[in-house]
């Protein structure tokens, strides 16, 4: 007996439909991805009212290449003196920053070596993610390593719409729990592929309130892998006209006040000096005594827009190329020279 034409038509339609992988349970996703997730412990120093103090920052990250590249958040590692990375099996290796973009809260670090058993994560096209999609975050909230939280994509935000200090970041908003220690960790889709890097949450209580923000993988790949944003290893702030007057900066000079410099960073190698004392002016705390950067490569360092131009230029330079910085130090204008790492 020959099949009826209608049955043949239905069969043809079914065969033409795309085949999708079976949905994985949260436990299956967790077991699949944890060999690629790392816990980051970074040591730095800061100036407080009590003087120079050491501190430890704990965050998370994800291994994205066989040669040891790990994506994480800039605020976890960008101005730290020492970075150690712990894998699922407990093995710890040293790492260094090789690219960073504070305007998107992203950093790329390179491991001294890749432990046996570590697994490179698969990165997904974050443009295909939709509001309502299930997501999973693995990290170390409050130092509790390899904790899983689950949720949904709540919204998607274009660059320069959520956080003025991070104008380059496209964000996913999620109700998956994000706490201190999750920063820099990966957010996975239901297939266990990385779709973003955890940045921060918005909270009135200090805990997680369902407003978590994750930088999309599209932004991370563009800034860290394609563009390789320059890492200088410095932290500081632009000086207002009021502060320029208070500090008696001559000739209407404007610039960027250096608060701290990471040991071994390009800024450190160039001879930049960080602050030494904390002062309160108009209710706001400043770490003073450090260099004021007036220009880098001849471009004034007087605003966020000018710093973007500087970063774009530095990203085009090859390793070993010289970098010049004009700084004001104790009333004297100096020219410092460093090199691209």
Predicted stretch roles:
Residues 81, 100-104, 154-162, 240-241, ...:
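Short, conserved beta-turn/loop elements at beta-strand boundaries and strand-helix junctions
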Residues 61-63, 95-97, 153, 187, ...:
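Conserved hydrophobic positions within beta-strands
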Residues 28, 74, 96, 110, ...:
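C-terminal recognition in membrane/secretory proteostasis and scaffolding
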Residues 21-60, 69, 73, 82, ...:
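N-terminal activation segment of mature serine protease catalytic domains
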Residues 45-46, 63-146, 180, 230, ...:
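Conserved active-site neighborhood of the chymotrypsin/trypsin-like protease fold
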Residues 7-18:
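Bacterial N-terminal signal peptides
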Residues 46-56, 80-83, 117-118, 138-151, ...:
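Active-site loop architecture of trypsin-fold serine endopeptidases
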């Amino acid at each position: 007996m020959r099949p009826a034409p209608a049955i043949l038509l239905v069969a043809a339609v079914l065969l033409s439909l795309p085949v999708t992988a079976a949905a994985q349970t949260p436990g299956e996703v967790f077991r699949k991805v944890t060999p690629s997730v790392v816990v980051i412990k970074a040591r730095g120093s800061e100036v407080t009212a009590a003087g120079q103090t050491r501190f430890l920052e704990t965050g998370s990250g994800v291994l994205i290449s066989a040669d040891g590249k790990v994506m994480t958040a800039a605020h976890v590692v960008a101005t730290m003196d020492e970075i150690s990375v712990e894998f699922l099996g407990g093995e710890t290796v040293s790492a260094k920053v090789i690219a960073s973009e504070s305007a998107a809260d992203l950093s790329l670090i390179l491991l001294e070596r890749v432990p046996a058993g570590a697994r490179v994560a698969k990165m997904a096209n974050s443009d295909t993610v939709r509001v309502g999609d299930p997501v999973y975050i693995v990290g170390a909230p409050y130092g509790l390593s390899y904790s899983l939280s689950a949720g949904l994509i709540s919204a998607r935000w274009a660059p320069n719409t959520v956080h003025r200090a991070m104008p380059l970041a496209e964000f996913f908003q999620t109700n998956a729990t994000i706490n201190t220690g999750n920063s820099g960790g990966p957010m996975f889709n239901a297939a266990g592929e990385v779709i973003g890097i955890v940045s921060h949450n918005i909270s009135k209580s200090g805990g997680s309130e369902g407003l978590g923000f994750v930088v999309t993988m599209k932004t991370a790949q563009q800034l860290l892998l394609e563009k390789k944003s320059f890492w200088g290893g410095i932290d500081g702030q632009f000086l207002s006209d009021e502060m320029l007057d208070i500090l008696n900066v001559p000739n209407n000079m404007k610039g960027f006040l250096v608060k701290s410099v990471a040991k071994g960073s390009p800024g450190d190698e160039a001879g930049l000096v960080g602050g030494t004392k904390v002062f309160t002016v108009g209710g706001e705390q400043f770490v003073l005594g450090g260099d004021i950067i007036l220009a880098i490569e001849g471009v004034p360092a007087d605003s966020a827009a000018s710093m973007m131009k500087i970063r774009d230029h530095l990203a085009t330079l090859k390793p070993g190329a010289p970098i010049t910085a004009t700084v004001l130090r104790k009333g004297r204008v100096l020219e410092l020279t460093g090199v691209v790492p």
